[in-house]
Amino acid sequence: MNRSSIRNFAIIAHIDHGKSTLADRLIESCDALAERDMKEQVLDSMDIERERGITIKAQTVRLKYTSKAGEVYYLNLVDTPGHVDFSYEVSRSLAACEGSLLVIDSSQGVEAQTLANVYKAIENNHEIITVLNKVDLVSADPEKVKSQVETIIGLDASDALLVSAKTGIGINDVLEAIIERLPAPEGDEEAPLKAVLVDSWYDPYLGIVILVRIKDGVLKKGMKICMMSTGAVYTVDNVGVFTPHKKMVDALSVGEIGFITAGIKELLACKVGDTVTEDARRCAEALPGFRATCPVVFCSLFPVDAGSFEHLREALGKLQLNDASFTFDIESSTALGYGFRCGFLGMLHLEVVQERLEREFDLDLTATAPSVVYKVTDKRNVTRDIHNPNDLPEAHEILKVEEPWIMATIMVPDQYLGSMLALCNGKRGERVDLSYTGNMALLQYRLPLAEIVFDFYDRLKSISKGYASFDWQMDGYMPAEVSKLTFLINSELVDALACIIHKSKIESRGREICERLKDLIPRQQYKIAIQAAVGSKIVARETISPYRKDVTAKVYGRDVTRKMKLLEKQKKGKKRLRSIGNITVPQSAFIQALQVKD
């Protein structure tokens, strides 16, 4: 295939600005699917994506387009996620393309994730086409949004395209702009094969499938390929592209994006960002690959049925193949048995992974409270990362603790600014900058990551009636005054409930969690004490009163000694029950107890 007829582009936008709908219209305009196969969010293959109305996995499709001049072009479209938790998917997709369609809702304007994604595209030296979507809405104001694009982002918006992905207005203009304004891929077809591994996933019929972008050379069926990071050699069984259905081809050449299968059995053999080359004629050096992302939120997942442990391990391995930003390690808990300590890029990422495990692999799971990574330096001046609250050393062994901070960018209508400032200040935030564009305020705040993990995003949306948008980047570590808050049920330590809390919130958080546990744990025939402790100091306590059988009901008259005898016997029985009885804490109680609202 002549590379001058190829265009590789990604669609980037803030969440809910119409990326997937625009992708649907482009597919429809190029007749890539029969009318009976067209449906909304055609590239969103997971049920979770359709239900939540979001894109989680970046998807590719090759479109064949005949221009107004009568020339045939092959367009490789990548529909990317919009949520901040899936920014790694976006960066990987952008590395495989030469240009981007920046989609902006013409009624909402530029939002926080719009900024984050466009900066990623600029880092990848992309040619950017600005597309103002939803121009058919009564509330649309394209001129105002053009002004925002120029003042906030710094892009020339004079040639921005006005589009309605829902009704199809302006779709042909987008297709023409792609072939006229985006560059063709560069590369040498005669050079040794050099391809970057963009994604991988497990297919029940084909085994491990890898998605590649060809930088140099040609990748053919039957060729022996080598993974440059491991040196492993495989023979290519199948070569294909998505149209959006799988379509087998004989070869992929410079600039093309497609998939291959090569009988790969080892999950760890497919490292995203790895360079694929021909074994017989290897390229001189590997491609730079992608900048690895580190998980920032950690949570433990335990199977409700202990016999499902191996099934969970296998499921996590298959998910990690498809999501390189997700990590997991084995851990054990006295309360919950064996499970895995998992790392995620954010709370939505955590929710999606847990939901996928439960749906796709039919697992019943218990999740503990999410926590962030603390850097702890002990008295011997040794620093280590603490992912699990139970690994935090005793207070007398610690020299200092540092917690992760983020730089948050918040865009909010000015009428909600006061409430937004109060929210950020209440989360121990430090204001960095405040500027205005029309009636929108652009806030920059430094915040501790631990403060935004649970409910910050929900409260931000609630305060602003849904109009505020939020994006964040890691911004280093700062000294922190934190302690480990532990919980005891009838004097037994429950390790699954331990959490690391800022010292200013220990008592209030301990009290709230104890109250929540009191409501969640079923009553027994004896009294249950729920205590929150820091070290040996009890900071909060709640008591679940027992069921009481009226043992004196059968005693007639005024036989006080008989009544006292029966009550004493009941007391001894309850004491014996309490000493041998195990409290059964419902699985749902662990996560519900720790999701405390401020």
Swiss-Prot record:
Membrane topology category: Peripheral membrane protein
Keywords on record: Cell inner membrane, Cell membrane, GTP-binding, Hydrolase, Membrane, Nucleotide-binding, Protein biosynthesis
Protein's cellular compartments: Cell inner membrane
GO annotation, cellular component aspect: plasma membrane
SMART domains in the cross-refs: EFG_C (SM00838)
Residues that bind GTP: 16-21, 133-136
Chief site of localization: membrane
EC annotation from Swiss-Prot or TrEMBL: 3.6.5.n1
Annotated Pfam families: EFG_C, EFG_III, GTP_EFTU, GTP_EFTU_D2, LepA_C
Molecular function in Gene Ontology: GTP binding; GTPase activity; guanosine tetraphosphate binding; ribosome binding; translation elongation factor activity
InterPro entries from the UniProt entry: EF-4 (IPR006297), EFG_II (IPR041095), EFG_III/V (IPR035647), EFG_V-like (IPR000640), EFTu-like_2 (IPR004161), G_TR_CS (IPR031157), LepA_C_sf (IPR038363), LepA_CTD (IPR013842)
Superkingdom, natural source: Bacteria
Reactions accelerated catalytically: GTP + H2O = GDP + phosphate + H(+)
Domain tr-type G: 4-186
GO BP terms: positive regulation of translation
Top-rank EC class of the record's enzyme: hydrolase
Family to which this protein belongs: Belongs to the TRAFAC class translation factor GTPase superfamily. Classic translation factor GTPase family. LepA subfamily.
NCBIfam families recorded: lepA (TIGR01393), small_GTP (TIGR00231)
Biological function: Required for accurate and efficient protein synthesis under certain stress conditions. May act as a fidelity factor of the translation reaction, by catalyzing a one-codon backward translocation of tRNAs on improperly translocated ribosomes. Back-translocation proceeds from a post-translocation (POST) complex to a pre-translocation (PRE) complex, thus giving elongation factor G a second chance to translocate the tRNAs correctly. Binds to ribosomes in a GTP-dependent manner.
Protein name (record): Elongation factor 4
Organism expressing this protein natively: Anaplasma phagocytophilum (strain HZ)
